[in-house]
Amino acid sequence: MYLSRNPSGAALAAILVALILSCNFPSSTAGIEYSDVLPDSFPSAPAESLPHFLLEPEDAYIVKNKPVELVCKANPATQIYFKCNGEWVNQNDHITKERVDDVTGLVVREVQIEVSRQQVEELFGLEDYWCQCVAWSSAGTTKSKRSYVRIAYLRKNFDQEPLGKEVALEQEALLQCRPPEGVPPAEVEWLKNEEIIDPTKDTNFLITIDHNLIIKQARLSDTANYTCVSKNIVAKRRSTTATVIVFVNGGWSSWTEWSPCNNRCGHGWQKRTRTCTNPAPLNGGTMCEGQQYQKFACNTMCPVDGGWTEWSKWSACSTECTHWRSRECNAPTPKNGGKDCSGMLLDSKNCTDGLCMQNKRVLGETKSRLLESTGDVALYAGLVVAIFIVIILLMAVGIVVYRRNCREFDTDITDSSAALTGGFHPVNFKTSRHDNSQLIHPAMQPDLTANAGIYRGNMYALQDSADKIPMTNSPLLDPLPNLKIKVYNSSTVGSSPGIHDGNNLLGTKPTGTYPSDNNIMNARNKNMSMQHLLTLPRDSSNSVTGTFGSLGGRLTFPNTGVSLLIPQGAIPQGKYYEMYLMINKRENTVLPSEGTQTILSPIITCGPTGLLLCKPVILTVPHCADINTSDWILQLKTQSHQGNWEEVVTLNEETLNTPCYCQLESHSCHTLLDQLGTYAFVGESYSRSAIKRLQLAIFAPMLCTSLEYNLKVYCVEDTPDALKEVLELEKTLGGYLVEEPKLLMFKDSYHNLRLSIHDIPHSLWRSKLMAKYQEIPFYHIWSGSQRTLHCTFTLERYSLAATELTCKICVRQVEGEGQIFQLHTLLEENVKSFDPFCSQAENSVTTHLGPYAFKIPFSIRQKICNSLDAPNSRGNDWRLLAQKLCMDRYLNYFATKASPTGVILDLWEALHQDDGDLNTLASALEEMGKSEMMLVMATDGDC
């Protein structure tokens, strides 16, 4: 090994460098440069191979003014030179070493140069300072990779420093930190009271990819001083300290028992107290609001002592020479604990002034016999009372046993009847209402059918109203004699036929509560729902299936708006899952709504449950909420294996523990899920101004050979699956859709939906509706428990020759919006039905596999993720992309993912499955200043 800085070698090298720098000549082959100007005196051997680099120069940073050393090593190599920024480095700046490899016997040449801060600063242009080695052998030249030399620095000021805050106990706290700009990029760590926070040891802390600190659930022990520390090879910077105070708001203890009335007689007060100690306010928490004590007026009846009346007159003188007088203790009678009268009730004295002929002995015997007879009477009276009490007890026990036997007997009869009839119990019991001036005879009831021909549950008359619409149960019942207007209902199920609670009748529900149609239905369907969850039958009419692997894909339910997007990498490599989507029939499912909630979407099961997913999948379901109004409390619910519904997330109330993310659009909800299962979207109104969208669809019979002609007006939720269900039902019943359905905005105002028919040509037709209008009760619509609600208008033509009908049907919510249908129907055999899904017939493919399911090519997607996943001090990273794509409602969900950009792009795929317009994504990237990504999309997208 020796150094090549010797005078003879320097002269030869200088000549070589001068020739190279002064000549502009093309290389003969790729990868061989300047080989034709090398001196002939260089040794070469035809058998030699191209130089191979054993050590290539690495990226380096200049700290302060200390130069960096770049080293490369190659064999076989006759010469090695450095080239920096396209210019050859002077040979005098090279330090060359060489040795013979003990194994191969080849000469290993090593070259080293130094790069100073001045050289790097003198470079002009956008490109960083770079160097690479060029090695020569007799076979040609080889270039090493480029190594970049940068001046290391770390600015003093943070782009954003954490700010102190006060946070309530068990609430989430976010401390933001953007480290100062530096080269190389600074590493960030957080200090809590000068101790390093390690999220792996304390899982209550989370440091996001953009260096923010999240306290998931603030504890009292988290009250501390927090500091953001940024460091690289140059320096270490500390932010200002942010003080986090975890406060506890005061809470009231339970009320004490009411104290005794403070006045033993007359008007007084009772008092009870509570204390603000459950918990006590801490660290500046608010005091309890409300009264610390309550008073209650009490009135204690004063005790009244008894008083004697006047003595009665003396009785006649008896044979014992004694007469009597008496008095009573009722002047006043003792009350409220007052004392009884003291003294004798009876008074007696001798009435002969001592002239009585009986001696004292006879008189004493008489008194003794009188006392004995009195004792016998008391004994006999006690025995009679005891016998009477025993008889009463025996009678009571007998009555209880008798009633219990009767109840069991009735239950057996009911169960047997249900077994024989399949659970279908027609009930004709109705209660007349004489307090309503608008009532007419029950036989004049319009047709209001829900799930006609599908549901086989118990049926009950809800109201005997003429101008309002009572609800019965199933169109499979034969109509009563002379009953021309029929009424049906699918979800009014009672526990015992013929027995009704007055509060459940139409129009008698108290303000502020809804009749619990779905609660009545849930009692019947809970066991059925449990079996449904376990077996999950695959009915082709309401389910679709597909098999997917690690490349992902999309499963679509045609004409329903329901789909499941499985991103690439969601299924483990080498695994294949058969996945399915199923729309659950509401009559067979426990309903998710409770109280004043309303169902806003179909109940969807995606499965199978329990799958191991590496990434979230996106479930898309339609909904019928008008989200332009801000009065909604919207929730996503899931059904447990026990059949109960549980809240998954309330929109705009997400925390780090929320397992999913919902992207709400005007007609659909796209949900990122880590677990498959049964889901539904429900809503509730804040202040009775929320609005849900309904579809109004009118059907007529395809063929009419009688004088009667029925027009059915369906009122269903504005979701594709609801209309699809009605179309399939009417197809089986021989009906057709007269014209395109219309939209109705239905407000949570307790007002019913009113339907009426007008402008009938009375010379040819007459209406058999005796009332002016029909009504569908508000809560039947709002609860969402009844899927195919409708009213029927029965018309009669005077002659079979009348084959044309024109009329108007008006549908509106009382004190709300409405729609008017101008109908013109022909009673012909070849009548054509309006098909709302005709434009979607082409898209009947249910499964798209691998790359065919995604709009963004995988190569473009990877480059976008690599560019945006890492946090940027200028903010043009994945957070800005989410903002540009309107997906920034809760960024912390994406921050917890390994690739936030990838999850955002998956959600974009779900939102744009119909249009797939990459221009929207390109526009967002352009606005972010990511023009290089647009170039990638233009080049790779054309391939």
Swiss-Prot record:
Q: Which GO terms describe its biological process?
A: anterior/posterior axon guidance
Which stretches make up the TSP type-1 domain?
A: 249-303, 305-357
What is this protein called in UniProt?
Netrin receptor UNC5B-a
Q: What Gene3D superfamilies does the database record attribute to this sequence?
A: 2.60.220.30, Death Domain, Fas, Immunoglobulins, Thrombospondin type-1 (TSP1) repeat
Positions of the Ig-like C2-type domain: 150-245
**Extracellular face: residue ranges?**
31-380
Q: Name one cellular component (GO) term.
A: plasma membrane
Note the InterPro entries from the entry: DEATH-like_dom_sf (IPR011029), Death_dom (IPR000488), Death_UNC5B (IPR042156), Ig-like_dom (IPR007110), Ig-like_dom_sf (IPR036179), Ig-like_fold (IPR013783), Ig_I-set (IPR013098), Ig_sub (IPR003599)
All copies of domain ZU5, residue ranges:
542-685
Q: What does this protein do?
A: Plays a role in cell-cell adhesion during embryonic development. Receptor for netrin required for axon guidance. Mediates axon repulsion of neuronal growth cones in the developing nervous system upon ligand binding.
For this UniProt entry, which segments traverse the membrane? 381-401
| Localization annotation | Cell membrane
